[in-house]
Regions:
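Short alpha-helix
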Residues: 143-158
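Conserved beta-strand signature within the Rossmann-like core of class I S-adenosyl-L-methionine
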Residues: 122-133
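A short, conserved alpha-helix within the catalytic core of class I
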Residues: 106-118
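A short acidic, Gly/Pro-enriched loop at the edge of an enzyme's catalytic core
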Residues: 90-99
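Class I SAM-dependent methyltransferase SAM/SAH-binding core
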Residues: 45-87
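S-adenosyl-L-methionine
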Residues: 1-32
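Conserved class I S-adenosyl-L-methionine
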Residues: 34-43
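Core SAM-dependent methyltransferase catalytic element
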Residues: 169-194
Length: 194
């Protein structure tokens, strides 16, 4: 186990969410080498830890950063405690990122700011729950569930979409998800391995 691999924690908010999402792992290589990655609403930091292991600097941002406190001594990890839902937008000024990762989180007013915070050739990797998920598990509140095609519509005009999916997944349990990988580039993006 490397120093940046997450360790199981029985008090985790997202039980069983120790390993990075396969969607994030698949598209992580699209983040330009040496650039800083933003793990937004990072929770345990499982995705940011993956990018640390890939050699990136990472900004871990969440309202409660206690689950990434073990990274406080790492010079490549910046920990930012902020409530993203106060209406102030991203608390990161004009910074641009080589990658932005968001999973299992939706605050619609932030979507335009995410595209604006992505640096040239940077990659946005976003995966969260969609409408219909309420039939299987939480979240059930429509405010926390993407409408069909919403993620594509939010980023398809500003970024080059490399991959998009919306539908029912059965692993590890049934859920409706939407996910997108998109780059801030006019040039054709290399396709990630399947």
């Amino acid at each position: 186990m490397t120093p940046h691999e997450p360790t199981p924690d029985p008090d985790m908010r997202h039980a069983g969410a120790v390993e990075p999402s396969p969607w994030v792992v698949r598209f992580a290589p699209l983040a330009p080498s040496g650039g800083t990655v933003l793990d937004l609403a990072c929770g345990t930091g499982r995705h940011g830890r993956h990018f640390l292991a890939r050699g990136h600097n990472v900004v871990f941002l969440d309202r409660d950063v206690s689950l990434v406190a073990d990274l406080a001594g790492d010079a490549r990890a910046e920990i930012v405690a902020a409530d993203l839902e106060t209406g102030e937008g991203l608390p990161l000024g004009t910074r641009r990122f080589a990658g932005i990762v968001v999973t299992n989180y939706l605050w619609r007013p932030l979507l335009p700011a995410l595209a604006a915070a992505l640096g040239r050739d940077g990659v946005l990797i976003y995966e969260t729950f969609g409408r219909g998920n309420e039939a299987y598990s939480r979240p059930r509140n429509p405010d926390h569930l993407l409408r069909p095609g919403e993620l594509f519509a939010a980023f398809g005009g500003a970024l080059q979409v490399v991959a998009y999916e919306c539908g029912l997944r059965h692993d590890p349990k049934p859920r409706i998800i939407q996910r997108i990988a998109a780059v801030n580039s006019d040039a054709p993006a290399p396709l990630a391995p399947e």
